[in-house]
């Protein structure tokens, strides 16, 4: 669980208190809006964190100002070890946007085409002056809250403890794994096995190349650890240091 980002590519590092990430991205959207920039923003959050006050404050500001941002709310079916029924009384998590007066809709998180079309639609809507949106994604977390939590979630191999996840629900979502199912869909649409194999080889090369690049990099100079994080350095942008 490495919390890193790449500011010049528009990716902010995740924050450990998850709702704060939505607040931060809303602030970025506000800044972009005030500057008149043609930029779209995305903030992702799980259903558990959507119960927090910070998240609601972010949505309220975005809706009031008509900011160019979309909030992606993933219903993972369980937050740490709390099921949705004990978190909210909404039937659909998309309904949370109604109170803020913003459009929302629900998609199947196992369908890559739905992801692409939904975010593209939200982007076009925001940048044409429509304001923020909320995309409710139905999916399921396949492991523990973090990997050190897997035994509590899935249960130990011995069966003791048995784990708290709903096994039938987990089996349902495992059968919807988008990697094999979307591959089958592409074959049914006319792509050939050779074309898919070539795509997969190209993707693997990209990942391997990125990994090799990172492994070859020198370790950061420890004397620079505080640069750009306090007002003493007077950094105008994140890129100065």
Locate predicted features:
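Conserved thiamine diphosphate
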Residues: 30-39, 90-121, 170-202
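Generic beta-sheet signal
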Residues: 39-43, 69, 129-137
């Amino acid at each position: 669980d490495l919390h890193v980002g790449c500011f010049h590519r528009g990716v902010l590092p995740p924050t450990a208190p998850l709702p704060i990430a939505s607040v931060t991205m809303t602030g970025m959207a506000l800044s972009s809006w005030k500057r008149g920039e043609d930029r779209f923003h995305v903030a992702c959050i799980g259903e558990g964190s959507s119960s927090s006050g910070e998240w609601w404050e972010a949505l309220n500001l975005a809706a009031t100002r008509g900011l160019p941002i979309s909030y992606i709310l993933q219903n993972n079916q369980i937050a740490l070890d709390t099921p949705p029924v004990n978190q909210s009384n909404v039937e659909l998590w998309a309904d949370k946007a109604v109170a803020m007066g913003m459009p929302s809709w629900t998609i199947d998180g196992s369908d890559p085409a739905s992801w692409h079309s939904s975010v593209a639609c939200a982007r076009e809507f925001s940048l044409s002056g429509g304001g923020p949106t909320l995309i409710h994604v139905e999916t399921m977390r396949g492991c523990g809250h973090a990997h050190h939590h897997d035994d509590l979630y899935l249960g130990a191999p011995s069966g003791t403890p048995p784990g708290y996840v709903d096994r039938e629900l987990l089996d349902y979502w495992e059968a919807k794994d988008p990697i094999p199912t979307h591959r089958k869909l592409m074959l049914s649409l006319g792509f050939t096995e050779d074309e898919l194999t070539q795509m997969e080889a190209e993707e693997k090369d990209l990942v391997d190349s990125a990994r090799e690049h990172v492994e070859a990099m020198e370790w950061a100079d420890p004397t620079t650890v505080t640069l750009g994080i306090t007002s003493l350095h007077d950094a105008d942008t994140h890129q100065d240091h």
